[in-house]
């Protein structure tokens, strides 16, 4: 049975197919993206040489913060003020990882342009309406958006070297795991999260040379779908703040924190986290070692370069996030967060 499929969901189309990148120009045209601006990176373009030729314009997205990057590119791709009544904004196609896709979503939220995403990592950004907005344009936006079209090529999404792939896979697993205990958790998001966890764990247990990359990629899509539906919780609050204030890398920070966060939550929310343990082939009291195993025994935050001098500031910032008020159990304290993070240091 082929793992390829087309998923139509409330106006969004997801095409999951081996070779989707090679067929991207035709698939884009088939779904109304005839003339488009392509946002990408040199690395991603090297894996899709024909796509740049099909684009009306190509814009490289450098490293940086999403609001600043989106603001800079907005000036380039936006229809001038006087033309807005006479012309529709040119669609945007994002070929790359989470940064590229989030920049496209941010611009689309301002201009009204349709957005298509062709992910080259397991960031999950292609499945969510979670993104920052262009700096200086926040008052021009009614809300955030998700791509209308996703072209998911499993080989492209899982092409990283083994250590990086494991960190990205745990990050993808975390998307679903964090959605299991929020106020918006529902049967659909729960099913997607648990299916994602099972698929990712099964693939990571395999020999790297024989790994089910389609399973990893599907797990990434489903986990991000669950997060988009039910929202985020403790794990993402901790990771996002550590990355922003303490300077640790994104995927690796998730790989270090998730085992400790889920072990912490297994005590507070056994009815939510117990099924997660079962999905990855373990028991609730063995979640931490199992997730560490799946992550390839990831490095601690200290080894990742996190700035311990800013940890108190980071914890105070975490406690201000509204999502923590909904974490099951007694109200979280500074000591709770400090202990969780210290275990991952």
Give a label for each model feature:
Residues 7, 37, 280-345:
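C-terminal charged capping/lid subdomain of soluble metabolic enzymes
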Residues 182-289:
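Active-site segments that bind and position negatively charged phosphate/pyrophosphate groups
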């Amino acid at each position: 049975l082929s793992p390829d499929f087309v998923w139509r969901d409330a106006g969004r189309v997801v095409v999951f197919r081996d070779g989707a990148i090679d067929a991207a120009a035709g698939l884009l045209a088939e779904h109304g993206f005839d003339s488009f601006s392509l946002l990408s990176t040199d690395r991603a373009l090297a894996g899709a040489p024909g796509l740049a030729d099909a684009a009306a314009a190509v814009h490289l997205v450098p490293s940086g913060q999403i609001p600043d990057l989106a603001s800079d590119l907005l000036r380039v791709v936006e229809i001038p003020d006087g033309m807005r009544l006479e012309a529709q904004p040119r669609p945007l196609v994002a070929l790359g990882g989470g940064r590229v896709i989030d920049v496209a979503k941010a611009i689309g939220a301002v201009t009204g342009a349709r957005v298509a995403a062709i992910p080259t990592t397991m960031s999950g950004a292609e499945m969510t309406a979670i993104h920052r907005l262009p700096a200086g344009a926040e008052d021009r936006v009614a809300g955030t958006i998700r791509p209308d079209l996703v072209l998911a090529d499993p080989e492209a999404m899982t092409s990283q070297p083994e250590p990086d792939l494991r960190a990205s896979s745990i990050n993808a697993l975390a998307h679903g795991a964090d959605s299991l205990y929020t106020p918006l958790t529902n049967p659909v998001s729960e099913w997607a999260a648990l299916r994602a966890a099972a698929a990712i764990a099964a693939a990571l247990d395999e020999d790297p040379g024989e790994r089910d990359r389609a399973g990893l990629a599907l797990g990434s899509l489903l986990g991000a779908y669950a997060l988009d539906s039910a929202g985020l919780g403790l794990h993402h609050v901790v990771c996002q703040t550590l990355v922003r204030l303490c300077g640790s890398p994104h995927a690796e920070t998730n790989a270090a924190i998730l085992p400790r966060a889920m072990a912490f939550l297994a005590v507070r929310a056994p009815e939510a986290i117990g099924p997660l343990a079962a999905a990855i082939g373990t028991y609730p009291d063995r979640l931490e070692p199992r997730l560490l195993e799946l992550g390839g025994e990831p490095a601690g935050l200290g080894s990742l370069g996190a700035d311990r001098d800013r940890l108190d500031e980071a914890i105070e910032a975490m406690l201000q996030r509204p999502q923590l008020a909904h974490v099951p159990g007694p109200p979280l304290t500074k000591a709770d967060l400090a202990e969780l993070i210290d275990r991952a240091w």
